[in-house]
Amino acid sequence: MSEALKILNNIRTLRAQARECTLETLEEMLEKLEVVVNERREEDSQAQAEIEERTRKLQQYREMLIADGIDPNELLNAMAVTKAAATKSKRAARPAKYKYIDENGETKTWTGQGRTPAVIKKAIEEQGKSLDDFLL
């Protein structure tokens, strides 16, 4: 809550601040505050009306489904299955494309994606080898 709202929410602070203002100024501030409060009430009532309308429509559609012999839970389950099938599945790991021996003497493989292993990079730059020399 901001300092201005804390002042407006505290009656003692309001009284102290009101002593420094004229009655006309206080009445003008009261009118403006009433306008803001009325606007907020309208917004809240409109939001509540939208929620009630949505609830009414959902109930109406539920009754229509039941009248047509469809259980709403059955529809939800069918939609969940469809949604699960539409979600992205993990792609399969790429097969290794290159083979090399690292600094420890271990044979390793590389798919060709991502950063080039340091051993391969060094061999290409310093020994003049090509990437084809490391193909499986």
Swiss-Prot record:
It is found in: Cytoplasm, Nucleoid. Residues 113-118 bind DNA. Keywords: Coiled coil, Cytoplasm, DNA-binding, Repressor, Transcription, Transcription regulation. It holds the Pfam family Histone_HNS. It comes from the Bacteria. Its main location: cytoplasm. Residues 13-67 form a coiled coil. The keyword Oxidoreductase does not apply. The keyword Nucleus does not apply. SUPFAM superfamilies: H-NS histone-like proteins. One of its GO terms (molecular function) is minor groove of adenine-thymine-rich DNA binding. GO terms for cellular component: cytosol; nucleoid; protein-DNA complex. Belongs to the histone-like protein H-NS family. Interacts with YmoA in the absence of DNA. Homodimer that oligomerizes on DNA into higher-order complexes that form bridges between disparate regions of DNA compacting it. Interacts with YmoA. A DNA-binding protein implicated in transcriptional repression and chromosome organization and compaction. Binds nucleation sites in AT-rich DNA and bridges them, forming higher-order nucleoprotein complexes and condensing the chromosome. As many horizontally transferred genes are AT-rich, it plays a central role in silencing foreign genes. A subset of genes are repressed by H-NS in association with YmoA. Complements a number of hns deficiencies in E.coli; represses the bgl operon, represses hemolysin expression. This is DNA-binding protein H-NS. It comes from Yersinia enterocolitica.
